[in-house]
C-alpha cells in the first residue's frame, strides 16, 4: 500500500553528502541518524566498514557526533554481510525484519534498496513514529514511513505498521 505522505512538519533535512544512502528520523525529537556509503577509493566500498553512520544532534545546535555505544548496538547500528563486490546485505540492529541491500550503480554512486509491503524502493529516508508513553529504553514503534524512489524513478512513500 502506497501513501502520499509528506515530510514531517518542521523536521530539518540533514546537509547533503556525496555518498548519502539514507537517514532516519523519529517522533521523539529532531535528532537524525545518517548512513553514508564508505568508499576506500572511487567505486570500491570498504569491506571492513561499508557504511559510515553518525548522528546530527539538532537538540545541541545541529552538531555531528558518532553514535553512542547504546545507539550502535541496540538502536541505529547495522550488521552487514558481503554478497559480492560492492553489494552488501544490511540489517538495522533494532529491527532485523527489514532487508536492505546496498549496491553501487554504474555511475559509481551507492544506494540502498528495500522491499516494503511488496514494493521495492530505493531508500532515501525513514521516519519512525514511536508510541507515546514509552521510555527511551523500551520504545515501541507505531509505524515506519519509508521514503524513496520506485522502479520508475518516481518519489514514493510507504507506511509500514509492525505487527
Give a label for each model feature.
Residues 7-71, 155-157:
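N-terminal export/targeting and maturation segments
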Residues 8, 162-163:
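Short, solvent-exposed mixed-charge patches
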Residues 27-29, 82-86, 136-140:
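Short, ordered beta-strand-loop transition motifs
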Residues 50-121:
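Mature extracytoplasmic domains of secretory-pathway proteins
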Residues 76-78, 131-134:
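Short secondary-structure capping micro-motifs at structural edges
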Residues 116-133:
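Charged, amphipathic alpha-helical segments
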Residues 133-159:
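Short, exposed beta-strand-loop hairpins at the edges of beta-sheets
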Amino acid at each position: 500500500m502506497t501513501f502520499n505522505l509528506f515530510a514531517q512538519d518542521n523536521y530539518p533535512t540533514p546537509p547533503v553528502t556525496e555518498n548519502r544512502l539514507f537517514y532516519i528520523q523519529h517522533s521523539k525529537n529532531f535528532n537524525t541518524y545518517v548512513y553514508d556509503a564508505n568508499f576506500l577509493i572511487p567505486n570500491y566500498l570498504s569491506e571492513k566498514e561499508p557504511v559510515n553512520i553518525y548522528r546530527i544532534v539538532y537538540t545541541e545546535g545541529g552538531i555531528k557526533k558518532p553514535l553512542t555505544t547504546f545507539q550502535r548496538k541496540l538502536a541505529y547500528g547495522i550488521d552487514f554481510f558481503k554478497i559480492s563486490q560492492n553489494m552488501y546485505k544490511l540489517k538495522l540492529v533494532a529491527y532485523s525484519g527489514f532487508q536492505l541491500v546496498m549496491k553501487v550503480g554504474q555511475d559509481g554512486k551507492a544506494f540502498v534498496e528495500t522491499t516494503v509491503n511488496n514494493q521495492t524502493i530505493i531508500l532515501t529516508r525513514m521516519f519512525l513514529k514511536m508510541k507515546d508513553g514509552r521510555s527511551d529504553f523500551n520504545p515501541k514503534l507505531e509505524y515506519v514511513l519509508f521514503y524513496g524512489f520506485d522502479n520508475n524513478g518516481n518519489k514514493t512513500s510507504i507506511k509500514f505498521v509492525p505487527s
